[in-house]
Every structure is written in structure tokens, then in C-alpha cells.
Regions:
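Glycine-centered hinge/linker elements that transmit conformational signals in sensory
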Residues: 176-177, 220-250
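Extracytoplasmic/periplasmic substrate-recognition and gating elements
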Residues: 55, 59, 157-159, 236, ...
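Conserved N-terminal structural module of periplasmic/extracytoplasmic solute-binding proteins
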Residues: 1-102, 250, 302, 325, ...
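Extracytoplasmic/periplasmic solute-binding protein
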Residues: 138-142, 147, 171-223, 266
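Hinge/lid segment of periplasmic solute-binding proteins
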Residues: 97-146, 205-208, 290-296, 361
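Extracytoplasmic "Venus flytrap"/periplasmic binding protein-like
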Residues: 56-123, 132, 157-160, 264-268, ...
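A structural signal for short loop-to-beta-strand junctions that line the ligand-binding cleft
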Residues: 90-91, 119-155, 190, 304-307, ...
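Long, aromatic- and glycine/proline-rich binding clefts that accommodate carbohydrate-like moieties
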Residues: 126, 130-131, 293-297, 343-391, ...
């Protein structure tokens, strides 16, 4: 549930963008309330950045107010849809980059001026694309996410004689087998903790085999392609890994997968680079693992690194906000060079290449930072939001792990995707 805090407002310098209320010529005379919905990742991992930005906004706009509300991923979309329908939407909302197109197409977001935001000329292209429609910018990239292998080097050392994560999948599977044998007395120990509904991972294997979730055809429509042979290969490969190496509850999703390692139940898992910090953080994990938990590139089945989903978040100003200029200025501040550097310093991938490039040579971020150029993304289709909301792909994976054939499960999933993907959700 969200944590609400009434705070004096915050923002950085730059020209106001969008419509609605405009900031006063003298910022100290500007009034209004800016309600911001941020995901609880910020509350858990970079609350100091949030506080600094809010303090700066308060200093610039002393007569304005900020209401900050932290949201959880599980129910944010439902809450936002209701808030928009009821006419009480936030002024600023954080959107996962697979969620943005739904709200762009529904007219829920206000356009913003790209030129007024720091580093906009070097934004990561895949992130900027999620905010762009008909040559207008409807949101601002916030941070990127690329998935990597997170592993306990001590567990690998004990079982294989090497603390290093294997560079090829063949070597990785051999190492996982040795780890499994070493820990066979513990039936809850997973050499590779790979959650069954983890569709971001499953689709990475689909991408590795040359498959895709959906394609845009010559008639101008999207259609599901999970039933294609290459996609089926990737899905089968993923399911085989889950069955063999995940000794936990196969129905559990990846939201708190770091806990398996923190509790001593996993030697490795596939996640966002920042999840390694959660494994060893005193509040969420086991600090004694600090020297053992490492990150590495996840090898794929084709002799190359496993293609990663380019995850991340965007920040948008809602179209009916009475404080559009103030809201856009808060976003400008929160995505400034200074703010993005604060994220980079915490091993979070910033929204632009200028600040991303140094992370390619940093041991704790190299695997994720170098994965960004070859990353894949979900279809930028009108109804993709509905496909996600209906959990079509996680449900397909669950059915396969319960015994449904890959052929039938993918055929059914494509049919469900086809019903939704071309209609704005």
C-alpha cells in the first residue's frame, strides 16, 4: 500500500512544458499542489534522492505543495485506471515502460518538450521510444533496467572449484549440476532460482532463439507469434531450466526472488542488477553474503549472452493536471544530470548514454550496462497494456509447468493476444 506524505514541492530549472496552469514568472509566487505517484523501488533504494529533489522543489516553489505517494507494482495500474476515471489522477505518475503506450493512446498524458530535459539528446533509444508517439514526447525516461546473472560465488567455488560464473550455457549447466549434487541433501536449494511465471526471463530465451511475442503484419495489425517454432524453442528451453533447477514453488513470481538467495536457498538467479544489493542489504537480506554475491552476464543457448529485456520506468504528467507546469518541472528535476548520477552511483542504469557509458567498465554494473544495446522490448502495440494486465504470458507459462503441451499453450496464448493487442486498452 502506498505511503503518502504531504511535502512542500520540488523541481529544477527549465522552461515549463505542456498546458494547464503555468508556473508564475516568479517561482516563489507559484501556487498549487503537485501529487506524485512513485513506485516503491524509490522508497526502498533511493529515498535520499527523492528527499533531495523534494527539498529543492520546496526551495524554488515555497507556496506550492507536493503530495508524494509510493505505489506497488502489483496494483498500481488498477489504482491509476480508477483515479483517471474518477477525475482524481496524480499530476505525475511513474509508469513501467511497458505501460506507457496504453496511457498515451487513451489521451491520459500531457505532451512534454524534450529539449527542456537534461541529456535528452543521449537518452537510451529503447527508453525514449516508449515515450514517443506521432513525433511527440509523452513521458520522460527515468531509469533503465537490464537483467543479469546474480550468483553466490562461494557456492560456485565449493561445488566447481571456481568462484567465477560460467561464460557459456554449456559450462553453466555443468556447474549447476555440480551445485545440485553438492546440495542434494537440501531439497529446497535451487542451483538456479528461475520462477515459473517469470515471463521477462522466458521471453529472453524466446529472443535468443530468434522468436518474438508478436509481429506487425502487412495488413497493419499485430498478431501473436508465440506459436512460431523459434518462439516455442525458447519457451521449452526456459521451462526445462525451471523444472530442473528451481526447487522452490514453481508458481511463485520473481517479485522477491532475491529472498531465495538471502535465505540460503539459491546459488544463482536472473534479475535486475540492483537486486544483488537487496540480497545483502541489512533490511532485506543477509549482510554476511556481501563478499560472495556477484553479478555476471547470463549466457544464452546460442553461444551469445542471453538477450535482456530493456526494463525501466518513465515519468509522465497527466493531461488533466491543474499544475502541468509545476509537475513537468518536478520531473525535470528528478531526471536531471545530478539526479541520474545519484542513481548511477547506486548501480542503477541512468536514462542516458552519457552517464551509462562509465558503468560499462564498473565491475558491479558492467554486465547490465553492456547488455543495453542488444536488449529486446515488448511490442509497441495499442493493446499491449491489456495483454500484460490479463497475464496471458505468465498464465501460459504456468499451464506449461502444470503439464500442458508447449504447442497447445502457445496456440492458446496467441489467440488471447490477438483478441487484445490491436485495441487500445
Amino acid at each position: 500500500m502506498a505511503l503518502a506524505a504531504a511535502l512542500t514541492a520540488c523541481s529544477s530549472s527549465g522552461s515549463p512544458s505542456g498546458g494547464g496552469q503555468s508556473a508564475s514568472a516568479d517561482p516563489k509566487d507559484a501556487t498549487g499542489t503537485v501529487t506524485v505517484w512513485l513506485m516503491d523501488d524509490a522508497q526502498k533504494n533511493w529515498p535520499d534522492l527523492v528527499q533531495r529533489v523534494n527539498d529543492e522543489f520546496a526551495a524554488k516553489y515555497p507556496k506550492a505543495n507536493l503530495k508524494l505517494v509510493y505505489q506497488g507494482w502489483a496494483d498500481k495500474v488498477g489504482k491509476l485506471d480508477k483515479a483517471l476515471a474518477d477525475g482524481n489522477a496524480p499530476d505525475v505518475v511513474e509508469l513501467g515502460n511497458t505501460e506507457t503506450m496504453k496511457y498515451v493512446l487513451s489521451g491520459a498524458l500531457a505532451p512534454v518538450d524534450r529539449t527542456t530535459f537534461d541529456n535528452s539528446d543521449s537518452w537510451i533509444k529503447a527508453l525514449a521510444n516508449t515515450c514517443t508517439y506521432q513525433d511527440k514526447l509523452w513521458c520522460v525516461p527515468y531509469y533503465a533496467g537490464a537483467r543479469v546473472a546474480i550468483y553466490n560465488s562461494a557456492a560456485f567455488q565449493q561445488a566447481t572449484g571456481s568462484p567465477d560464473f560460467p561464460k557459456t550455457e554449456g559450462d553453466l549447466l555443468a556447474a549447476l549440476d555440480k551445485i545440485s549434487d553438492k546440495n542434494k541433501s537440501d531439497r529446497t536449494f535451487s542451483p538456479l532460482y528461475l520462477p515459473g511465471p517469470y515471463w521477462y526471463a522466458a521471453m529472453s530465451y524466446v529472443a535468443a532463439y530468434g522468436g518474438s511475442i508478436a509481429k506487425f503484419d502487412s495488413s497493419g495489425n499485430w498478431h501473436g507469434t508465440l506459436h512460431d517454432a523459434k518462439s516455442q524453442q525458447g519457451i521449452s528451453h526456459f521451462a526445462d531450466l525451471v523444472r530442473k533447477y528451481n526447487k522452490g514453488d514453481l508458481t511463485q513470481n520473481e517479485q522477491n526472488q532475491y529472498e531465495a538467495m538471502a535465505r540460503g536457498h539459491a546459488a544463482s538467479f536472473y534479475g535486475n542488477g540492483y537486486e544483488a544489493a537487496s540480497v545483502v542489504a541489512p533490511g532485506t537480506g543477509d549482510a554476511s553474503l556481501k563478499d560472495s554475491v556477484k553479478v555476471a552476464t547470463m549466457p544464452g543457448p546460442d553461444g551469445k549472452p542471453l538477450p535482456t529485456f530493456i526494463g525501466g520506468s518513465d515519468l509522465a504528467v497527466t493531461a488533466k493536471s491543474p499544475s502541468v507546469a509545476l509537475a513537468a518541472d518536478w520531473v525535470r528535476m528528478f531526471t536531471s544530470t545530478k539526479s541520474e548520477q545519484a542513481l548511477a552511483d547506486k548501480d542503477i542504469l541512468p536514462n542516458n548514454l552519457n552517464q551509462l557509458n562509465p558503468l560499462k567498465n564498473k565491475p558491479t554494473t558492467a554486465a547490465a550496462a553492456n547488455a543495453v544495446p542488444d536488449a529486446w522490448f515488448t511490442p509497441l502495440a495499442p493493446g499491449w497494456g491489456a495483454v500484460e494486465k490479463q497475464k496471458i504470458i505468465p498464465d501460459m507459462l504456468a499451464a506449461i509447468l502444470k503439464g500442458k503441451s508447449v504447442d497447445q499453450a502457445t496456440k492458446d496464448a496467441d489467440a488471447a493476444i490477438d483478441q487484445l493487442i490491436n485495441s487500445p486498452s
